[in-house]
Amino acid sequence: MNLTRDPTGAEIARFIATRTGAQMVELMRCISEPAAQAAFTANLLAAPPVVDARPAASERARKALNAFVRFRCYYVAIPMFKQWPMKKLSNLIGLLWEADPNKSLWSLMTKAWSTIRDQIGKEQAPLDQFFSIICPHLRLPDPALYLEIHGWTLTVDQEGDPTISRSLNSRSSSIGTGNIDIALSVEDIIAYVQSFGYAASFTPTTNVSSPTFLGQSTNLPLENNNPTTAATQAASKIAQARLLARNKRRAKRQTAKETGYRVNLDQDILNAHQISPPPMNRYMPDPYSTFAPTPNHSPNPFYDGLTGFLSEQASIEQVNAATLHNTHSLSDSGLSGDMSYMTMDNFATNMPNLIDYDAFRLGANEDVTLPLFDDIAHA
């Protein structure tokens, strides 16, 4: 069984505080007594302000900065534009923007600044300071040189209004990012300006990469006939030449360091040979081929007979040498000193008996056949 209870004062106050205007009018009409109406009205006026229990709507995201607006704010400072009001320069700057080759860079820079502004506020992120840091880094033309670099000519018409024109032969060049060879993103720009102390309170979002990036090449064409651009190009070439020379010097030193060990080792070997030369009477064989021809061991009658003769003579005792036919003892005084002899341990024999001199006599047959020493096959 449900019991009916009277509401507490806090519950009544909460009920009244959460009523709409129309509902409050209905409540006033339900109170018929004037004294009760007066008391209700007094309590209503003394009640605290109504607090909406619903979460407050989040602040609407600020609109990203327009790239053309920032381009106009930067290049309105062209010295030749100072004598005219902004309403006469808007069309001129619009023409410059249409022909500018760096629109993508301006869009990227303005997006980076908008990201900083949305987090820390415009007061903590001065726009002029932002562009004064990033524009020279990306090598965007200075306002004082913009018209000259891109071939624009400023003239004044008959009514005194400024006009700009461009020669048909003028060729605009993409001036910018000449010293960057990577994909440029919003995070890259923010990191660069923060390195100079700009927007120090800004905290980059972690693990989030911007989908906006720009790839730039280092070999961008420059104005050939413009002195300012030519000077910039010359300075870049000088820097590259210095870098190349430095790399060559480093490579040369490294090569000398690596080859120095081999040179020192060769010198040590040479010094060792000079200090301890080989003996003069030591036989040093010349290099020879290990692929010598194989001897031909076919029978040869001449050498077989010579071998048998020597073997037979050596087997006879030397004491009987004098009794052999056509032999003499070495001590025999009858040996002629003008004749060659073959000796072997008190054994002597007449060499003419072994050598045929017929081929060497005067008037001998020049076609005589000599013995063939063909025990080794000649290649």
Curated annotation (Swiss-Prot):
Q: Family assignment?
A: Belongs to the MATALPHA1 family.
Q: Can you list the disulfide-bonded cysteine pairs?
A: none
Provide the function of this protein: Mating type proteins are sequence specific DNA-binding proteins that act as master switches in fungal differentiation by controlling gene expression in a cell type-specific fashion. Transcriptional activator that induces the transcription of alpha-specific genes.
Q: By which gene is this protein encoded? A: MAT1
MF terms in GO: DNA binding, bending
Task: Please give the superkingdom of this protein's source.
Answer: Eukaryota
Return the PROSITE patterns for the record.
Answer: ALPHA_BOX (PS51325)
On whether Mitochondrion is a keyword of this UniProt record, the answer is: no
Biological process, per Gene Ontology? positive regulation of mating-type specific transcription, DNA-templated; single fertilization
Residues in the DNA-binding region are 60-117
Q: Which organism is it from?
A: Curvularia kusanoi (Cochliobolus kusanoi)
Keywords noted in UniProt: DNA-binding, Fertilization, Nucleus, Transcription, Transcription regulation
InterPro entries of this UniProt entry? MATalpha_HMGbox
**Got a GO cellular component term for this one?**
nucleus
Subcellular location, record wording: Nucleus
What's the name of the protein? Mating-type protein MAT-1
